[in-house]
């Protein structure tokens, strides 16, 4: 049944999932004041595993449903299903096993709310976004981005069970940051790959509204993102260390967005795309250090 294990590893989009589970991990840490109890550590480890399995399953389902699109795009034409290294039924079985394992772990050994939120996120990305939104509207990334923004809340839920309104409020701030970050992140890539998207008949914003309009939207979202990133500090969720890091990271992000309005070359949008990945990792790392590590130094 199974081909080279590497093909199945590639089906999970490991680099993308790594960023997803990192933000979930930060959500877990931020949810716990002080030193975590053994029960919180246990729930965190199992929650991390369950979220990782679900995210991997969603990535595999996405490749299964998008195989005909991936075949038309240079960026994705190498994927295992496209080149025939795995068969559709193998991907379906693989993803199903991951989903079952994820739900068993989350329901039996973490808590029900984490399982429900995780499953809803999986369906939101793998089905609602992939099957409908991606093909239906130029706002696909904006609307569908909510599913991809959920991991910090999933991590938060794993160690708290979302018992109070503050759990929902604080974890929602983390979700909001990723939700606002998602459009400029993907639109920068879409500008560079717009011919691929047009060929595959995917209505990404640069295809439907043009590059100039997309660059302006990137600028708008970047300004909103910079403002939203102040909220964890303003509500007392994080301290000065995070604030300083967020200001620097957003200053660079805004510079990229401003430069995108009149880029020096065609490759500049990819430079912003790659920086946006570093940006999100660093921003959540600042949240992590500020909340937990810094007080112990």
UniProtKB/Swiss-Prot annotation:
Catalytic activity: heme b + (2E,6E)-farnesyl diphosphate + H2O = Fe(II)-heme o + diphosphate
Membrane topology annotation: Multi-pass membrane protein
Disulphides: none
Keyword Transmembrane helix: yes
EC class of the enzyme, as a word: transferase
EC code(s) of this entry: 2.5.1.141
Listed GO biological process terms: heme O biosynthetic process
Residue spans crossing the bilayer: 16-36, 45-65, 93-113, 114-134, 141-161, 172-192, 223-243, 244-264, 277-297
Family annotation (InterPro entries): Protohaem_IX_farnesylTrfase (IPR006369), UbiA_prenyltransferase (IPR000537), UbiA_prenylTrfase_CS (IPR030470), UbiA_sf (IPR044878)
GO terms of molecular function: protoheme IX farnesyltransferase activity
Function: Converts heme B (protoheme IX) to heme O by substitution of the vinyl group on carbon 2 of heme B porphyrin ring with a hydroxyethyl farnesyl side group.
Homology family: Belongs to the UbiA prenyltransferase family. Protoheme IX farnesyltransferase subfamily.
Note: Carbon 2 of the heme B porphyrin ring is defined according to the Fischer nomenclature.
Protein name, per record: Protoheme IX farnesyltransferase
Organism per entry: Stenotrophomonas maltophilia (strain R551-3)
């Amino acid at each position: 049944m199974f081909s080279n294990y590497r093909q199945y590893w590639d089906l999970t989009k490991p680099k993308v999932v790594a960023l997803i589970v990192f933000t979930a991990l930060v959500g877990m840490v931020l949810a716990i004041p002080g030193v975590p109890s053994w029960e919180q550590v246990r729930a965190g480890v199992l929650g991390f595993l369950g979220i990782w399995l679900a995210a991997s399953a969603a990535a595999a389902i996405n490749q299964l449903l998008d195989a005909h699109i991936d075949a038309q795009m240079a960026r994705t034409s190498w994927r295992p299903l496209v080149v025939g290294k795995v068969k559709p039924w193998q991907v379906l079985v693989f993803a199903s096993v991951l989903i079952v394992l994820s739900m068993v772990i989350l329901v039996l050994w973490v808590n029900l709310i984490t399982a429900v939120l995780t499953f809803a996120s999986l369906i939101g990305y793998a089905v609602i976004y992939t099957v409908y939104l991606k093909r239906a509207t130029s706002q696909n990334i904006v609307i569908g981005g909510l599913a991809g923004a959920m991991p910090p809340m999933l991590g938060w839920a794993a160690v708290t069970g979302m018992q109070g309104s503050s759990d929902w409020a604080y974890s929602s701030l983390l979700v909001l940051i990723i939700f606002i970050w998602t459009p400029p992140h993907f639109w920068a890539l879409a500008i560079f790959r717009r011919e691929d998207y047009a060929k595959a008949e995917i209505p990404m914003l640069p295809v439907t509204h043009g590059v100039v309009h997309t660059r302006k939207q990137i600028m708008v979202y970047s300004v909103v993102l910079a403002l939203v990133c102040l909220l964890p500090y303003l509500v007392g969720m994080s301290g000065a260390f995070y604030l300083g890091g967020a200001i620097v990271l957003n200053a660079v992000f805004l510079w990229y967005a401003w430069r995108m309005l009149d880029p020096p070359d065609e490759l500049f949008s990819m430079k912003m795309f790659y920086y946006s990945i570093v940006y999100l990792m660093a921003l959540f790392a600042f949240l992590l250090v500020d909340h937990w590590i810094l007080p112990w130094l």
